[in-house]
Amino acid sequence: MLPLVALVGRPNVGKSTLFNALTLTRDALVHDQPGVTRDRHYGVCRIDGQPLFAVVDTGGMVGKEDGLAGATARQARLAVAEADVVLFVVNVREGASALDDDILAWLRKLSQPTLLVINKIDGVSDTTVHSEFAHYGFSDVVPVSAAHRQGLDDLIEQVLAWLPERSIGEAFNEDSERIHIAFVGRPNVGKSTLVNRLLGEERMIVSDVPGTTRDSITVDLERDELRYRLVDTAGLRRKSKVEEAVEKFSAFKTLQAIEQCQVAVLLLDAGEGVTDQDATVLAAILDAGKALVVAMNKWDGLATYQREQAEDLLSRKLGFVNWAEVVRLSAKHGSGLRELFRAIHRAHVSALRQFSTSEVNKALEIAYQTAPPPSIRGHVSKLRYVHPAGSNPPTFIVHGTRLKVLPDTYKRYLENFFRKRFKLVGTPVRFLFREGDNPYEGRKNVLSERQIQRRRRLMRHVKRK
């Protein structure tokens, strides 16, 4: 399971800015006005695409208006109860306040490890930073400037040292032979019905009321001599619709299931098409870099013209993930299930494929010769060599020069070329671009004695002229 880190503190200390900096997103609303964040929401801290831990941002706890027993404080308490490590965020420019003292007193009653994060240190002397909160008696203090990303590496290092020794990979090590599949989508599209149909029993509660499934439920299945682990998740809804505390936790469990799976099945309602909520779920899958199968449920209930409309809408809304296979099925009646498992298997094989350095360099050479990078303001990027850097998703590191000006269109060309050449289906393909250092930079050419004598003769000849 992905470890969880909670950000707690009074309003306007920079928790949301720190959340955005750790997750490399702008998911948390940032404003100088205190109290902008009311609810808690989740993200994932990654390095080079690899997830390290989940982060939960909470609303600022206001003393007079809410009190520690108010609605915002309840959200903070729930976040802390879920968390493995708590980051107590304070503002060095405003110094310690009575509300900071109250929050600290509450945190000290809990069992979770707590780090003191002193934010907004830019422009503040080191003496002030270390003395302002010294009376709190923390042994682990990390000064940062979230807005300028100062001190974040030290913070991440401290957090990792405090987290329990577990990782996403442990979920697979329990049964590495099983294909881990997460069924995700917005509420009431038929995820539980589909899992029940696959299992041949009423394992999941099924209802017409959206949100019946509140937690991620894991079951094992063997089919066609292959072993699977199925995860039925709670539906991800728009943030404005997620109100109950238990439902917020369900959303986090769904994000965890996406992080831990090997193949994500995005279930859509064929009659309603692709909605904004579906796009939100898809974004979480793509952000995690997981293999993807799109399943159009309730296909049997559509007339011919409705199916044509659904196909047209799908191609327009999801054209940017045309590498994912689309399966038309009916969870209620069981049609299309064999095609679903075939698509899952193809996506899984593609996502975990291993590549040799020689074959990917041959592919890069052919791609480069077929369509060289365009000239940008008189500069042309040069791609020297590539090597595989991992799987699930397949990742390649390209080395060269002037790669910062390499257009996004050419990067997509490389992705499509590699996908077609290696017959990769149902999985993202990632490229990382590294500009090589000049190996001769800073080195002085050492002349031999013969070269020195020759240079002297030339210089005397020049002077006589």
From Swiss-Prot:
Binding-site positions, GTP 2: 185-192, 232-236, 297-300
Domain annotation EngA-type G: ranges: 3-167, 179-352
PROSITE patterns documented for this protein: G_ENGA
Pfam families associated with the record: KH_dom-like (PF14714), MMR_HSR1 (PF01926)
Keywords, ordered alphabetically: GTP-binding, Nucleotide-binding, Repeat, Ribosome biogenesis
Gene3D superfamilies tied to this protein: 3.30.300.20, P-loop containing nucleotide triphosphate hydrolases
Signal peptide: none
SUPFAM superfamilies: P-loop containing nucleoside triphosphate hydrolases
Residues annotated as binding GTP 1: 9-16, 57-61, 119-122
Ranges of residues in domain KH-like: 353-437
Domain of life: Bacteria
InterPro entries: AAA+_ATPase, G_ENGA, GTP-bd, GTPase_Der, KH_dom-like, KH_dom-like_a/b, P-loop_NTPase, Small_GTP-bd
Subunit and interaction comment: Associates with the 50S ribosomal subunit.
Protein role: GTPase that plays an essential role in the late steps of ribosome biogenesis.
NCBIfam families the UniProt entry points to: GTPase_EngA (TIGR03594), small_GTP (TIGR00231)
Family in the record: Belongs to the TRAFAC class TrmE-Era-EngA-EngB-Septin-like GTPase superfamily. EngA (Der) GTPase family.
Protein name per the record: GTPase Der
Protein source organism: Xylella fastidiosa (strain Temecula1 / ATCC 700964)
